[in-house]
A protein has these predicted regions:
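Positively charged
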Residues: 1-196
Length: 196
């Protein structure tokens, strides 16, 4: 497992709701936390590690063993209040930062790995992180929420990411979109089918 970088196909995939949690998925979630800590992040969404599943992990403390590890499965955001502009970055767009307007407060409802429903009212940085990670599940990146001027300012960096990915694909070191689509379909088949 690795953190995918822009413009990888799966980053733009609209994730499917999870209907099944098993030991293998729990292990993948543990790996997501490990990757997040290695990259000094506070959140990581399934799409960012090539899992097309509606789930993300968060720990506002950044460091393993500190803070609280939270898993959000099939999150639903509501009661967004107020607006606040703030600087954001993303583990899938390393070393790029930009101003994004987000709601100051948000209510989130989700499930944990035990299938228990929980909810929370968040504000400040926690609200921003939850909105950022939830966007990933819809194939939306923070750069999509920036002003036109902000996007233009980082256009050169984005083009470098695009050229690097094209080069990897040309060298056969990155799968084609069709190969990725097949793998995505396998994940969806395994974890997103209605219970019988």
């Amino acid at each position: 497992m690795q953190i995918l970088t822009y413009p990888h196909y799966t980053l733009r995939y609209k994730s499917k709701p999870v209907t099944r949690v098993d030991a293998a998925l729990r292990k993948l979630v543990a790996e997501m936390f490990d990757l997040m800590y290695e990259a000094s992040g506070v959140g990581l969404a399934g799409n960012q590690v090539d899992l097309p599943l509606r789930l993300f992990v968060v720990n506002m403390a950044v460091e393993q063993g500190q803070g609280e590890e939270l898993v959000f499965i099939n999150p639903v955001l509501s009661h967004l209040k107020g607006n606040e502009e703030g600087d954001e970055g993303c583990l899938s767009l390393p070393e790029l930062y930009g101003n994004v307007v987000r709601a100051k407060q948000v209510h989130v409802q989700a499930y944990n790995l035990r299938g228990e429903e929980f909810s929370a009212d968040l504000d400040g940085l926690s609200a921003r992180v939850i909105q950022h990670e939830n966007d990933h599940l819809d194939g939306v990146l923070f750069i999509d929420r920036m002003t036109t001027a902000g996007k233009l300012a980082m256009r050169e960096s984005l083009e470098e990411f695009e050229l690097e990915q094209k080069s990897l694909r040309d060298l056969g070191q990155l799968e084609s979109d069709q190969e990725i689509e097949l793998r995505v379909a396998e994940w969806v088949q395994k974890y997103c089918q209605p219970s019988e």
